[in-house]
Amino acid sequence: MNPRRKSRLKVVVLIMFSVAVAAGLTLYALSQNIDLFYTPSEIVKGKNNDPQLKPAVGQRIRVGGMVVEGSVKRDDKTLKVEFNLNDIGPAITVEYEGILPDLFREGQGIVAQGVLVEPTRLKASEVLAKHDENYMPPELGDKMKQQHNAVGVAEGDLKGESIRDKAELDRTFNTLQGESK
């Protein structure tokens, strides 16, 4: 092989090696910022009720659900707050130190991001509250529909409008129309 070809080959190999190292470092950096989304039921039972698919203790995750009524405990001396979060199944405990969003309250849907410190305990670094009574993050809505359908809850019940509620509204509406004639 002549010297010119050798030098070109060295340059090509060096460039390919540099690109491979850069790609590897980029993928490593991105993997550190990926937070998988779970519902409280999936944390306790695993995704699709498979215990093999539970998040590991120490893993960074995002979890979405509803704040359980009566579960919020605030520390009088610090900004530490502890509350339970559930969907339709079991609840997990979330601990957070910081200022909660204005829309945070019991019975409210939230998404918490943090590290799983015990199998059912999340140390949150960020808590996000939904913006109005109808908003739900798409991923949380999809997961809750899957959980509810598996348990036998009707689609209308997820929206707070069961068939019984709609029938009651129809009767009230018809009664009011009859009185106005």
Curated annotation (Swiss-Prot):
The chain crosses the membrane at residues 9-29. One of its GO terms (biological process) is cytochrome complex assembly. The keyword Heme applies. It is a single-pass type II membrane protein. Residues 30-181 are periplasmic. Keywords: Cell inner membrane, Cell membrane, Cytochrome c-type biogenesis, Heme, Iron, Membrane, Metal-binding, Signal-anchor, Transmembrane, Transmembrane helix. Heme binds at residues 131, 135. The keyword Thylakoid does not apply. Its main location: membrane. It is found in: Cell inner membrane. Heme chaperone required for the biogenesis of c-type cytochromes. Transiently binds heme delivered by CcmC and transfers the heme to apo-cytochromes in a process facilitated by CcmF and CcmH. PANTHER family: CYTOCHROME C-TYPE BIOGENESIS PROTEIN CCME HOMOLOG, MITOCHONDRIAL (PTHR34128:SF2). Belongs to the CcmE/CycJ family. This is Cytochrome c-type biogenesis protein CcmE. It comes from Haemophilus ducreyi (strain 35000HP / ATCC 700724).
